[in-house]
Amino acid sequence: MNELVDTTEMYLRTIYDLEEEGVTPLRARIAERLDQSGPTVSQTVSRMERDGLLRVAGDRHLELTEKGRALAIAVMRKHRLAERLLVDVIGLPWEEVHAEACRWEHVMSEDVERRLVKVLNNPTTSPFGNPIPGLVELGVGPEPGADDANLVRLTELPAGSPVAVVVRQLTEHVQGDIDLITRLKDAGVVPNARVTVETTPGGGVTIVIPGHENVTLPHEMAHAVKVEKV
């Protein structure tokens, strides 16, 4: 796989990540997420716009075209199927899974994807609770259910009294922070875990699990965790 294709797919998936998190996709956000300079990002975005993969809207946010979204979905599908394989079969430590899946997402064929779906018993979510998109396009299974309607971000919980919730999704941005994802795992903050959360004065959130050390998330990371109220 050549470097140009890898870069294009990485940008598409990052825009998809931002959309999932409810963060406006701007070139500045891509620069932050991928640790690239502003000029480099602008040059790549311009090339992708010429290639018909995205549009730069009037307010400067990035919009995926139909062609770009289809490719972004395919890349994310490969990424999350790879995560399932790495966790469920290979047993790779949680903190290493995201970075490894970022490599696999660029080289996996659709034939391998279909075989993985069978081997993994038709998964619809990643080990981190995120829906695997584009399964219908692959012709192997249904889209994930519309359970997202019941989910809220930690930053959307009311301030004040502690709130009991069930952890449902840890987004790609959270997974990319190795120290944070390790602390969350060690504290038992994983999908389907019941925890208590309290909003901190600075807009962050403290997660409390009996028998474990509390974990405090800054606003940016708390926004990237979805939960369901108990």
Curated annotation (Swiss-Prot):
SUPFAM superfamilies: C-terminal domain of transcriptional repressors, Iron-dependent repressor protein, dimerization domain, Winged helix' DNA-binding domain. InterPro entries: DtxR/IdeR_SH3, DtxR_MntR_Metal-Reg, Fe-transptr_FeoA-like, Fe_dep_repressor, Fe_dep_repressor_sf, FeoA_core_dom, HTH_DTXR, Iron_dep_repressor. GO terms for cellular component: cytoplasm; peptidoglycan-based cell wall; plasma membrane. It comes from the Bacteria. Its main location: cytoplasm. Residues 4-65 form the HTH dtxR-type domain. GO terms for molecular function: cadmium ion binding; cobalt ion binding; DNA binding; DNA-binding transcription factor activity; ferrous iron binding; iron ion binding; manganese ion binding; nickel cation binding. Keywords: Activator, Cytoplasm, DNA-binding, Iron, Repressor, Transcription, Transcription regulation. The keyword Repressor applies. One of its GO terms (biological process) is negative regulation of DNA-templated transcription. It holds the Pfam family Fe_dep_repr_C. It is found in: Cytoplasm. PANTHER family: IRON (METAL) DEPENDENT REPRESSOR, DTXR FAMILY, IRON-DEPENDENT REPRESSOR IDER. Metal-dependent DNA-binding protein that controls transcription of many genes involved in iron metabolism. Acts as a repressor of siderophore biosynthesis and as a positive modulator of iron storage. Also regulates expression of transporters, proteins involved in siderophore synthesis, iron storage and transcriptional regulators. Belongs to the DtxR/MntR family. Homodimer. This is Iron-dependent repressor IdeR.
